[in-house]
Each structure stands twice: as C-alpha cells, then as structure tokens.
C-alpha cells in the first residue's frame, strides 16, 4: 500500500490565526513567499502540493508553472473548476504543463458547491447540472489526451467537430485525475473519471462508508485510490499538542471577533457544499472522534475546506493516519498551515 503526503501552498502569507476574512487560496502574489513555501515542502519530503482554486484568486496554471521552475522533485495537484474554459483547451493546457513540469502535475477537479462562487465567474447552473457538465467535460478531456484521431462529440453542454490535440501528456495514459465532492451527484461522476477520490477529514467509520459508496459507483474492476485531508497539530507530548490546539482555536476566535464575525457557525448555518455540511454535523456530534480527530476549528470557521485536525505527538498522529490507511485507503493527505 502506497501513501502519499500532500501539502498546500498559497501565493501570499495567510492564516485564520491572523485574518479570517482572507482566503487561503486567494489574494495577492508574493513571489519570494511562493518559492520559499514550495521549497519548504520539497525539503520536508512532501510528495505533492495542492494549488487551490477560488473565484477571486490567482490562476493556478501560472502558479504551478512558476513553482515547477523553482523546484526539482516536488509534484503538484492543480485544482481546476470545469466549465470556464473549453475542455479541449483545458486538455491541451494540462498536457503542455505536464511536459514543462517534467511529469509532475495532477489535476484536482472541483465542480463547485457554492452558487455564489460560481456566479462570480458567470456560471448560473444549479448544483446537479454542474456535475452533469463535469461528466461531459472529463469525457472530452480524457479523450483529447488519448485519442490518436480527431473526433466529434455531441452532448448536452458541449458539441465538438474534429477535436484533436497534437500535444499529449508526458504521463501515460494521462495526467492523474483527483476528484472532490460529497454529494450523490459528485460520487457518480468522480467514481467514473478519477484516479484518486478525495475526502475531508471525517471519522473513520464515515470514511469507510464513503469509500464503499465510491467503489460501488465505479466501473467494474477500476483501481481507485483515496485521499483524506487533515490538519496535523503536533506537540512533544500529547498534553502539549492539545494545549497548542486550544491555543490555535482561541486565536481563530479572537481574530473572528476583531473582524466582526460570529464565533461559531451556529445551528442555523448550513453551507451549500455537502462536504462542509457533513463536517459541521460531525462537529455538532462531539469535539473529538476516534480519540484524536478534533472538530472545533471546523465549527468555528463554517467548515470552509480542510478544517478538522489530528492532535497528538508525531507518533500518535502517525498511528491515527495508519488507521485511515487501513480503512482500505491507498492515499493519505495532510494539509494545513495550522498543523505546522
């Protein structure tokens, strides 16, 4: 069983500890910070880093191209939202970047769980319709990557005549596809197209159930791998790790008070994204699941992304990660500035 550790880089220093109004995947660009952040991951032995996506942030293709030139071994997971460039163009862009990065990229497909996010870029399709579009989009992208002859395509969202790309991915049979999404519509599309299905950090029993659901929806015989996003909060002793965790939470709450944001998502708050909603439900059930899966940061921030943590000594957190791996996962992901 292989295990891959994935970090995350942004384009400027940002943290919920200091300013809860800034996005970890958006904002301005600090070139020196980007280079340093990437090198820290490479020198620290991370296998890959996620370059995130938001409707107000820098373009991930350019970020990956820049960081690939500043590193040698580190691989990249480029978040990409279908629907805003043609799938034929996306396929060529990714294949080109695969060559210029010497085969170090993968693409993370995020269809989008927030109508407001989508509408900033002019997308007014509803949630399930967006996933039907993603299905067509990935059909076309994969075919462009692998087809040796021009092809036509007639779908609900895309109609193509003699589509073809002279540039094919360096990686064969194509650039690895990661996929995120917790809804039923997401599972059907992701199980069909992805090489790696990504989850946020939920209790082990829930992860086992979700793995079973994705595998059941996948084509017969497909070899799927799985990723879990968690924030490691480490200490020399377990007591020091929990002290650090509560300090981090207090800093987040203080920064939210200063920004005029309520401390907790509250019972009436319900995000559109199904994954975020699930994390809030687990946080409402209890603060700690499976001995050290800690949920209060998810509750305090509205579960905007990877917001659950594993708390303990390095050895204890490693033991907890091994339990996720033994949930028949092939891939484990650790992300989050708060865990460093």
Region roles according to the model:
Residues 170, 183-209, 213:
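Long hydrophobic segments that form regular secondary structure
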Residues 3-9, 49-51, 75-80, 105-109, ...:
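Hydrophobic faces of well-ordered beta-strands that scaffold small-molecule active sites
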Residues 26-40, 179-189, 312-324:
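Short, acidic/polar
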Residues 38-43, 65-73, 94, 98-105, ...:
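Acidic (Asp/Glu)-rich catalytic clusters
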Residues 87-96, 187, 235-245:
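Catalytic cores of alpha/beta
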Residues 2-14, 26, 121, 127-171, ...:
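An alpha-helical appendage that flanks or caps ligand/catalytic pockets
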Residues 51-60, 83-88, 202-208, 234, ...:
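Acidic-and-aromatic substrate-binding clefts and catalytic sites of carbohydrate-active enzymes
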Residues 1-71, 168-175:
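N-terminal beta1-alpha1-beta2 module of alpha/beta enzyme domains
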């Amino acid at each position: 069983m292989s295990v891959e550790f994935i970090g995350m880089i942004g384009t400027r220093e940002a943290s919920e500890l200091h300013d809860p109004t800034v996005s970890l995947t958006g904002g301005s660009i600090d070139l020196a910070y980007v280079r340093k952040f990437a090198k820290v991951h490479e020198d620290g032995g991370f296998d890959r880093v996620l370059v995130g996506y938001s409707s107000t942030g820098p373009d991930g293709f350019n970020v990956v191209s820049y960081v690939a030139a500043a590193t040698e071994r580190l691989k990249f997971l480029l978040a990409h939202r279908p629907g805003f460039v043609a799938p034929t163009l996306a396929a060529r862009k990714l294949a080109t970047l695969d060559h210029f990065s010497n085969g170090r990229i993968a693409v993370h497909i995020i269809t989008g769980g927030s109508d407001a996010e989508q509408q900033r870029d002019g997308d007014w399709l509803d949630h399930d319709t967006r996933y039907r579009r993603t299905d067509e989009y990935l059909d076309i992208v994969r075919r462009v990557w692998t087809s040796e002859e021009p092809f036509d395509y007639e779908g609900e969202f895309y109609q193509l005549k003699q589509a073809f790309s002279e540039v094919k991915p360096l990686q064969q049979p194509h650039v690895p596809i990661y996929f995120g999404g917790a809804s039923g519509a997401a599972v059907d599309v992701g199980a069909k197209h992805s090489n790696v299905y990504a989850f946020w950090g939920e209790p082990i029993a829930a992860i086992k159930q979700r793995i079973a659901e994705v595998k059941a929806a996948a084509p017969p015989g497909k070899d799927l791998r799985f990723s879990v996003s968690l924030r490691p909060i480490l200490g020399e002793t377990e007591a020091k790790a929990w002290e650090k965790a509560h300090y981090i939470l207090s800093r987040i709450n203080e920064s939210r008070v200063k920004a005029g944001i309520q401390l907790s998502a509250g019972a009436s708050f319900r995000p559109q994204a199904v994954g975020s909603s699930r994390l809030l439900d687990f946080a409402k059930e209890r603060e700690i699941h499976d001995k050290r899966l800690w949920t209060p940061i998810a509750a305090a921030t509205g579960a905007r992304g990877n917001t659950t943590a594993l708390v303990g000594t390095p050895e204890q957190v490693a033991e907890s990660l091994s339990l996720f791996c033994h949930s028949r996962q092939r891939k484990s992901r650790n992300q989050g500035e708060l865990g460093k």
